[in-house]
Amino acid sequence: MRLHTMMTRFALLALLAIPLVANASPSHMKIAADNEPGQRIMINGRVFGSDGKPHGVVEIYAYHTDAQGLYRRDRSKGSARLGGTLVTASDGSYSIDTIKPAPYPNRDIPAHIHIRLRGPGINQQDEIRFEGNGPTICHLIQNRCNVDFRLR
């Protein structure tokens, strides 16, 4: 009986030590909850090194405005409410499930998602834009787009 009690306590402690995360994979993040107002989008892509080869295990921090163009900061975290962090897979791939951000109200700046790439020797800021031309433009096709990043 005593061994059974010890094993039960061990199993319970082991279960409590498992982090409870909403993301199925560290290379995927869900920024906006299902009930967040706005157009749902999925962004997939890869991170490449300056040599053009896939670069894995890069931290991506992303944040953006809501469907009204406002950040509405989460005071408890001191950061944008719609934001999060992921780590790219070994092949550099990542995916972000969120809503399409709106442009800032009364400003002539296209809707965009702020991106920070970090890792050993890496500290790069970028953005995903929803208008214009360039390598990090999100051209939505059926609410999906592909955006790759090249490290500088």
Where on the chain are the PLM-derived regions?
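Bacterial N-terminal signal peptides that target proteins for export
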Residues: 2-11
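Bacterial N-terminal signal peptides
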Residues: 10-19
